[in-house]
Amino acid sequence: MKRARTVVLLVAAAVAGCGEPERPADANSRPPVLLRIGHVGHDHHLALYVAALEGERFLKDGGIGLKEVKAKEVYDLLEDGRAVARLRLLKVGGGSRMPAAMSRGEIDVGLGGTMPVAKFADGGQPFKIICPLQTDGDMLVMQKDSPVADWAGFVAAARSADKPLRIGYKAPVAVAKLVFEGALKAERIPYALDASDGDTRVVLVNFGSEKSPLPMMEIRAIDGFVMNQPGVAVAVDKGLGKVVAELRDLPPRGKWVNHPCCCVAATTDTLAKHAGPVKALLKVLLLSTQLIQQDQALAISCASRWTKYGLAVEKASIPTIGYVAEPTDTWMAGMATWAERVREVKLFTGKYADASPQQFVDDVCDLALCRAAAAELRAAGKLK
């Protein structure tokens, strides 16, 4: 009778457990830390997507990489055979949406624009830029049948046109807008957000950070737009515009070359609690950036696979973007240039309002983990 009761209890326990998820035999096999990673979904964040799509390559070659759990959503970050974190990738939107999501506690680490991150930090949010992602990749696009063919032609048209040129931009703190305004100022071309001033030669039109400028181009509500890739390549591919200038080449001469665009940012709480896993993540991004630099064809293929844009779009987009994951002297100088530029337009109204460029860079950036990650990879012969 006792034996029968034991059998019944075992069967009951088995039945009760039928709906339970399978548990790993070794509790240590589960990643100890969950990091929620916010991203936008376009090719400025290609380092993350290459890391995800080519995870097995990195694990085989370098002993560190991402193992897919759920495609495009969940990955285990492995280093030397040990799971150091589980990454949950969340598409949070561009412009100010990424730092806004971080401020609400929805993500721990975010990929997005340097200036939106800095603007939130200026307002008191405990955010730090911990790693570059890329530079450049911003363009001036005009209507396909516009007589404007280059920057000199744009300047001439702005000065001589019967009415102000209408140029779209995606967000007040968008990198492309800040560069474009700087170039207009250098050329002494009056611009404004409306045409109420008779001296205005360029009217800036906000088409929204999550909207495409293409509908406005199609109905000719704007004469052109300034924007980052791959939106530019999409417009050209659809026959709704032509590139007349890369913003890196605009005046003042040399000022915008290799300008910082997107970065990796994190909360100070995340950095304090999870420095090891974050450093491991940065190692993966450093290695994937190196692969992008070495194999552009692979980079284009990965971009198309992740973003779902056609190969033609990514073939036009990727070569115009500078992928960089280390804070080089050029990148640091570019951050100081941003500090000067945003001071001119009074973008900062909080703790950076009166900061010098060096004070701004020193406070908004915490690059210790990135530099440590790069040093460890080089010591192991994995990073050139």
PLM regions with names:
Residues R343-K384:
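Conserved C-terminal helix/tail region of periplasmic/extracytoplasmic solute-binding proteins
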Residues L34-L35, G41-K91, S96-R97, S103-I107, ...:
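Short, polar/charged alpha-helical segment
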Residues C18-P21:
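Bacterial signal peptide processing site
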Residues M115, S209-R305:
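Pocket-lining segment of extracytoplasmic ligand-binding domains
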Residues T114, P126, P132-P215, I219, ...:
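A conserved helix-loop-strand patch within extracytoplasmic ligand-binding domains
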Residues A272-G350:
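Secondary-structure end/capping motifs
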Residues V69-E79, A83-A100, G113, Y191-I219, ...:
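Short helix-initiation/N-cap motifs at beta->coil->alpha
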Residues K91, P99, D108-G113, K128-I129, ...:
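Paired acidic/hydrophobic, glycine-rich loop segments that form the ligand-binding mouth/hinge
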